[in-house]
Each structure stands twice: as C-alpha cells, then as structure tokens.
C-alpha cells in the first residue's frame, strides 16, 4: 500500500481543515499541495536520501501561506501576503529497527503536541522563557 496519499495538514475542528493531496513525485521528492490556487496553496515536501553509508536522512518542508487578495485593475486576485517555512531534517541509522523508528515518530509527535513548550511558544509568537 502506498503512503503517498492525501491527509489533513491543518486540523481546525472540521470546517477550517486544510487537506493536502499528492501533486508531484519527481527525483525522489514527494509533494503534497492544498486545493487553493497555487499562489495561496499549502505545500508539503518529503524526500529520503542515503546521507552516508550508515544513515538515511528525511528532509521535510512545509509552506504555510498568509492568504490575502490583491486588487489589480479592479479584479481581486488571490495572493499570499507572506509565507512561513518549516524545514526539518531527520537522520536515522540504517540499522534502526521498525520499533526504533516508531519511537522516533512518537518523539516527533510529542515535540509538536498541543500545549507543549515549542508549539506554545510558536502559537504565542514568542520565545522560550
């Protein structure tokens, strides 16, 4: 079974959810994009590379747009006022077992879990204090 499937990127209680769907898979880079116009789309990319004889490296990127419109010649056009970029690299030794990798995923989920220090600092647009 493929894991290159659509998923909910932003869970906002149902109505404001942002779903991203597979859009491209070239040169080993999987890309998911939301259904918004390209200029306003959320985008996720993920690639897996052999970074050394002993390690496999995952590179994950997420683009979050600030959705806005711009009037050009009397026509409102969709634009992104700005974008926020997340870049994450994860290196896993090639001899890690599946259960080791499941534990790594649990650590990633805990890192970004609602209410924990890092997402709280980001959501409040502040630092760690």
Swiss-Prot record:
Pfam families noted in UniProt: Levi_coat
Region (Viral RNA-binding): 31-104
Highest taxon of the lineage: Viruses
Single GO biological process annotation from the record: regulation of translation
Disulfide bonds: none
Intracellular or extracellular location(s): Virion
GO molecular function: RNA binding; structural molecule activity
GO CC annotation, single: T=3 icosahedral viral capsid
Keywords on record: Capsid protein, Repressor, RNA-binding, T=3 icosahedral capsid protein, Translation regulation, Virion
InterPro entries hit by this protein: Levivir_coat, Phage_RNA-type_capsid
Subunit structure: Homodimer. The capsid proteins form dimers that assemble by group of 5. Twelve such pentamers are linked together with free dimers. The homodimers binds to the viral RNA via an operator hairpin, but also to many other RNA sequences in the viral genome; this interaction probably shifts the virus from the replicative to the assembly phase and ensures specific encapsidation of the viral genome.
Function: Capsid protein self-assembles to form an icosahedral capsid with a T=3 symmetry, about 26 nm in diameter, and consisting of 89 capsid proteins dimers (178 capsid proteins). Involved in viral genome encapsidation through the interaction between a capsid protein dimer and the multiple packaging signals present in the RNA genome. The capsid also contains 1 copy of the A2 maturation protein.
Family: Belongs to the Leviviricetes capsid protein family.
Entry protein name: Capsid protein
Species, as recorded: Enterobacteria phage R17 (Bacteriophage R17)
């Amino acid at each position: 079974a493929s894991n290159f499937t659509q998923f909910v990127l932003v869970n906002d209680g149902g109505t404001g959810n942002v779903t991203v769907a597979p859009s491209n898979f070239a040169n080993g880079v999987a890309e998911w994009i939301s259904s918004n116009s390209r200029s306003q789309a959320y985008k996720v990319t993920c690639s897996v590379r052999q970074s050394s004889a002993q390690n496999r490296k995952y590179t994950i990127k997420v683009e979050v747009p600030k959705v806005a419109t711009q009037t050009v010649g009397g026509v409102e056009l969709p634009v992104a006022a700005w974008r926020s970029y997340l870049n994450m690299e994860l290196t896993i030794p090639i001899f890690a077992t599946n259960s080791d990798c499941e534990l790594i995923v649990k650590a990633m989920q805990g890192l970004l879990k609602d209410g924990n220090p890092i997402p709280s600092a980001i959501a409040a647009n502040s630092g760690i204090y």
